[in-house]
Structure formats: structure tokens, C-alpha cells
Curated annotation (Swiss-Prot):
E.C. no: 2.7.1.130
Descriptive protein name: Tetraacyldisaccharide 4'-kinase
Record-stated family: Belongs to the LpxK family.
Species of origin: Janthinobacterium sp. (strain Marseille) (Minibacterium massiliensis)
EC main group: transferase
Function: Transfers the gamma-phosphate of ATP to the 4'-position of a tetraacyldisaccharide 1-phosphate intermediate (termed DS-1-P) to form tetraacyldisaccharide 1,4'-bis-phosphate (lipid IVA).
A Gene Ontology molecular function term of the record: ATP binding
An example Gene Ontology CC term for this record: plasma membrane
Pathway info: Glycolipid biosynthesis; lipid IV(A) biosynthesis; lipid IV(A) from (3R)-3-hydroxytetradecanoyl-[acyl-carrier-protein] and UDP-N-acetyl-alpha-D-glucosamine: step 6/6
Catalytic activity: a lipid A disaccharide + ATP = a lipid IVA + ADP + H(+)
Cross-referenced HAMAP family: LpxK (MF_00409)
One Pfam family matching this protein: LpxK
Lineage of the species this protein comes from: Bacteria, Pseudomonadati, Pseudomonadota, Betaproteobacteria, Burkholderiales
InterPro entries per the UniProt record, alphabetical: LpxK, P-loop_NTPase
Length: 347
């Protein structure tokens, strides 16, 4: 396929998976990066830099491994479980590609290029107040002013935004674990694996290198596909596979997410055979990458769907089907988070 991940992305993926020569050559730069990060954390810990506490509890969902690990599905799951616990949650986010200093509300009708694809997906799926902007504290303050009913805030990413005080930190990893365990740029980590947090969540793997044994397992489950131009029209993923002597349709699976292999693996687990198109993360779909694709069915992620709907040519392409995924986690995590928010501890 013409539109594929860059050679640099592939190189970094391979480099960060092992402690090879290329990674070793970058260790001096990683030492500088790590030292500066440690000084910044120490400044907040010692009170030299001030963290601002908001009038409602704050839960931060983030990762220290660069790239996608599944934060958005986890954030949507948290919105639902907190709502079930009696809270009225709101979500704040940086918003990929957002350059506006003024906090901006996100609705399902917002443009992805103005608010970011992940916040747009959260607004669409979670049906709660969502705002984006570069300054998390300003965004949170604006959201609370616009929605005084909100009594807990979820920060989609923002783990390193220390100026915003938080009550709960959830750090998410996937099957890549900690990679080679080194900090950027020699490795994939923004901070050491040993950094303090309240909960560690592992997405889509029974175990991963370099992670604590008490990590809470998360699975992304997707069993159906929905027509992009009519999401009331659904079909089981298994219906796209060959069966009873019938030939399966030719399928293209496309993903512009941080870890497209996870999406492709989900489709394979449903028994599908397909050609892969791994697009760059946050691919904007301003141009139609499927215009010259000869396939009967094109399966895409929800994150890509919010952008495809805003391109008329893609919106009218009847071959496009969206595969929604839902996070499944141990219910004990929800209980522990709620207890922590209420100021009580669990033995």
C-alpha cells in the first residue's frame, strides 16, 4: 500500500524493543532527558513548583510508553463505571494537533482537526462533557464552569502535566511492556517504569516484560462491525469470514492508531483474512487512502471513523465498516478507584 507507516516509525519500533547498538548510541541523550525529567518531578515534589488542586477529584489516565496503549477505551470505560457509582464525570484532554490556547468544548459534531480524534471519539461514545486545550488546569476550570454538575474529572493523558494535582493515577501498558526499559530516545519510555502511580493496567496481554506482577488486565473486545454511513446497520465480524463453502469477501483492514497490530490481531481472532494498511497514527483522512483499493469490505477503527465521517467521499463509501471495541477490566479496579475518590482505603 502506498500509505504506510514511515521508515522512521518502523526503525524506532525495532530499536526500542531491544538493547541493540542503535539504542546504546542514544543512551547519553537519554541520560540528559532522564535527568531533566527527574529535576522537574523533584521541583513539584519539594514545592518549588506549584501544583494546582481543582475543586473536584481528578483521575489521570496515561502512559509512559510513547504511542498508543489503549487510553481512550479505558477512559470511556471509566466514564461508565463512575457514572454507575453515582458520579457525573467530565473529560479533559490535550487533543492531538490542537494549537488553540483557549479551552474548547468537544461535541460529536466537532471537527477532528480542531479538537483531536481521541477527544471526539470520547464525546461520541461516552456522552459526557469533554474539553480540550494545551493547559490542563485552564481546560478543567473551563469545563467545571460550563458544567457545574460535574463532580469528577478524567484526564485522557496528562500524566506528565504535574501542574495539575491529581487524586488517582492510572498508567497503561500493552503487550510491548516497557520495551527495552530505557528512556527516550534510546527507549520508548517518557519516565522510568518505577515511577509512582496508583494502578498499573496491562492491555491485551497476560504478561509483559518489565511490569509489576500486580498489573490489572484489560481486554479490548470487538465482536461486530457497523456500517460507516449507517451505524444502525450491524454485522457480526464472523460474517465476513468464509463459511459453508462460500467465498469470503476481499477485506482490507486499515488502522491509523498507535499500535495497529492490536487491531489486526482482534480481526484475526474473529477468523478473518485480510490485507493490512497500517496508516500513521492520527492520520487525518483529508485524502482518501482507499480510492484505488480493490476490496469488497474495508474495516476501520472507531478512532479513524470519526475522521472518515467528515470526508464526503469516505462517508459515502459503502465498503467501510467500523469495528467498535469495548474495554473489559476486573470490576475490583472500579471499586478501588471509587473508594480512593471517596477518601477511604481498601485493605
Amino acid at each position: 500500500m502506498a500509505l504506510q507507516r514511515s521508515n522512521l516509525e518502523e526503525f524506532l519500533t525495532q530499536t526500542w524493543a531491544q538493547r541493540g547498538l542503535a539504542a546504546c548510541m542514544l543512551l547519553p541523550v537519554s541520560a540528559v532527558f532522564g535527568g531533566l525529567s527527574a529535576l522537574r518531578r523533584a521541583a513539584y515534589r519539594l514545592g518549588l513548583s506549584k501544583s494546582e488542586r481543582l475543586p473536584v477529584p481528578v483521575v489521570v489516565v496515561g502512559n509512559i510508553f510513547v504511542g498508543g496503549t489503549g487510553k481512550t477505551p479505558l477512559t470511556i470505560w471509566l466514564v461508565h463505571v463512575l457514572r454507575q457509582a453515582g458520579y457525573t464525570p467530565g473529560v479533559i484532554s490535550r487533543g492531538y494537533g490542537v494549537h488553540n490556547d483557549v479551552p474548547q468544548a468537544v461535541t460529536p459534531q466537532s471537527l477532528a482537526q480542531e479538537v483531536g480524534d481521541e477527544p471526539l471519539l470520547i464525546a461520541y461514545r461516552a456522552e459526557c462533557p469533554v474539553m480540550v486545550g494545551r493547559d490542563r488546569v485552564a481546560v478543567a476550570t473551563a469545563l467545571l464552569a460550563a458544567h457545574p454538575e460535574v463532580d469528577v474529572l478524567l484526564s485522557d493523558d496528562g500524566l506528565q502535566h504535574y501542574r495539575m494535582a491529581r487524586d488517582v493515577e492510572i498508567v497503561l501498558f500493552d503487550g510491548r511492556g516497557a520495551g527495552n526499559g530505557w528512556l527516550l530516545p534510546a527507549g520508548p519510555l517518557r519516565e522510568p517504569v518505577s515511577r509512582r502511580r496508583d494502578f498499573t493496567v496491562l492491555n491485551g496481554a497476560a504478561d509483559a516484560p518489565g511490569l509489576p506482577p500486580d498489573a490489572i488486565r484489560m481486554q479490548l473486545v470487538g465482536m461486530t462491525a457497523e456500517k460507516l454511513n449507517d451505524r444502525s446497520q450491524t454485522s457480526a465480524l464472523s460474517s465476513f469470514a468464509a463459511s459453508d463453502g462460500k467465498h469470503a469477501p476481499t477485506i482490507l483492514a486499515a488502522a491509523g492508531i498507535g499500535n495497529p497490530g492490536r487491531f489486526f490481531g482482534l480481526l484475526r481472532s474473529a477468523g478473518l483474512q485480510f490485507e493490512e494498511m497500517a496508516l500513521p497514527d492520527h492520520y487525518d483522512f483529508a485524502d482518501n487512502p482507499f480510492a484505488h483499493v480493490k476490496a469488497d469490505v474495508i474495516l476501520i477503527t472507531e478512532k479513524d471513523a470519526v475522521k472518515c465521517r467528515q470526508n464526503e467521499g469516505l462517508r459515502n463509501d459503502t465498503r467501510l465498516w467500523v469495528v467498535p471495541v469495548t474495554a473489559q477490566l476486573d470490576g475490583a479496579l472500579a471499586e478501588k478507584i471509587v473508594e480512593k475518590l471517596r477518601g477511604r482505603s481498601i485493605a
